[in-house]
Amino acid sequence: NVLVSMGADGALLLAETGRVYRARLRSAQPVVSTVGAGDSVTAGFLAGLLDTEDYALALRLGTACGSATAYSACLASRDMIEAVLPAVEITTL
């Protein structure tokens, strides 16, 4: 798997299955700090993949984690991540 975090432009995932997924936010909030946002994308994606074995759901969670972290001064809380999740849109390319 190859996961590319693209900041405000979302993320791309090339899954080992050969499918390509794109994550975007339908609405965004002001960025407070990008420190740790990429790491949060990776951690959220891995947690989601281990939990569900579903690439689209894992990418959605990873994108929400990274975005929520960027919207805060420190790492995002679970509540913050859950608030961002509905705004994450996944498409298959």
PLM-predicted stretches and their roles:
Residues N1-L93:
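Conserved phosphate-binding/catalytic region of the ribokinase-like
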